[in-house]
Amino acid sequence: EKQRISKILEKTEIDFSEKQDKTEDEEKRQELIKNLVISADTFIAYRPSFRLHTIIAGYPWFLDWGRDSLISFEGLLLKTKKYELAKEVLLTMVRDIKYGLVPNGYSGFDNRPLYNSVDASLLLFEQIQKYINYTGDYEFVEKNIYDKLEKIIENYIKGIDIDNNNIYLDSDFLISSGTENTQNTWMDAKVNGIAVTPRNGKAVEIN
């Protein structure tokens, strides 16, 4: 276990070497960052059904969620220089794209992809750009992902209707999504099938 942790810390961009002239605050900060790097590694999990790695949204009951996985992608995999795992996670994210939508998650009962997210596909673009910035690996993106990015753009412009998501680019070039009881943003709580905070239309963080 000590060897595994040492390897995790060695790969990061952060200097964890022992220095004589460190202040007490610097030592505390370094120890905090070290603990965060080690803890972050526990959220990277292998999905046997995909034969690929993914990012778990939260223990003990959350599986991988497209939105959460992509938001945490840079910190968990790029800052820590886990570039091979980063490629696997990107392949996991694009594996079940349907009509331009990255799955927001998978059913815990039958592993069925769930498409209740308007922003996961948009976050994918952002994280792929970051992957390229860190690695310069255009070849991987061009070979495995580029055509899927094109399809996302085409479908958002044309309009998407899966499970009443009703996502489309409006005439004012803002993205509209959902119905009164469709929850496609991070505020996705429902009680008895009714949205607690209806956010259909043009949510500010999506545009």
List where the protein language model places each region.
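Acidic, mature catalytic/reactive cores of soluble proteins
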Residues: E1-N207
